[in-house]
Amino acid sequence: MDNINCLFNELLVIIIDFLSDNDKIKFITTCSRLYWFIDKIHYNSVYDYNKISHLSFVDKFKRIRFHAVNAGSIPSIVTDLVLDNNFTDSLKTCNLSKLLRIKLNFHQYKKNRNHILSNVKIDCSNSITISQIRYKTLKPTRLFSLIEPFSLLRPFILSDPYPINRIQIKGYDRDTNYGIPVHTPPEEILEDFGKHLEDIDKLITKNYKKFFPIKKSRPAYIPIVSRNSESSRQSNLNSPNDSVKFNEFNKSNKSTKTNPNNIHNIVTTMNSNKNFHKNKYKYQNRIIPKHSKYPKKFSKNKYH
């Protein structure tokens, strides 16, 4: 009968081990008969050493976490060790045979890496990162301040351990008092900001002229070639300044416009192609005003 009871107990322990730790406690505390198994089963979750150290079956816990301040207080049954940031001792004298995980900073790891077993998982996430150093040493003053205008142009604040009287960060050179910049009047800030805007304006203008050059405008006159040899020779000798412009021609008398003898003095714009004949081989560059009469030998239907 006793053998049957022992077999039943072993089978019951195996069944309980499949449950989670919370379900194990709930199941065991249902009656005094099952409570007898409380020190016969194992607990798989991570528990704090200070909360379970008074129990007689503390060796049944597979994961025990301990926060160490000094090396003398670390127990030998610890599996998850967390070193405090102020921990400066060595782990050489500690018995860490059951250690599975350790959490420490970079300086502590550099000091005790030879005393940690190779199968131990190391976590250095609580070490100081580059972003934390940048935030502490280059912390800006009032990044999103609504009280002082242009507060982003102020230099950065350095921490107290830097014994300097003058700093220069990102192009700003200001007087400091124990690492803290001296107060600058708003007028000087506005003046500096105006200088930066002026430099930016000059740079934009320079680049615009470089990549988008200004095109030279075409002259508002064209040389007139007439069938008369004397008039053509005279038009070639005339300079652009001596020629009659289109606007001046419009202001002149009607007799000047309609007189065919003055046709070589007329200067038209480059886009007035309607006044040219389409037959450019026989009557090349001959200009006849639109309001003037056609010669008899020209046909309106043929050339216009």
Swiss-Prot record:
This is Uncharacterized protein L167. Residues 246-262 have a biased composition (Low complexity). It comes from Acanthamoeba polyphaga mimivirus (APMV). Residues 226-244 have a biased composition (Polar residues). Residues 226-263 are annotated as: Disordered.
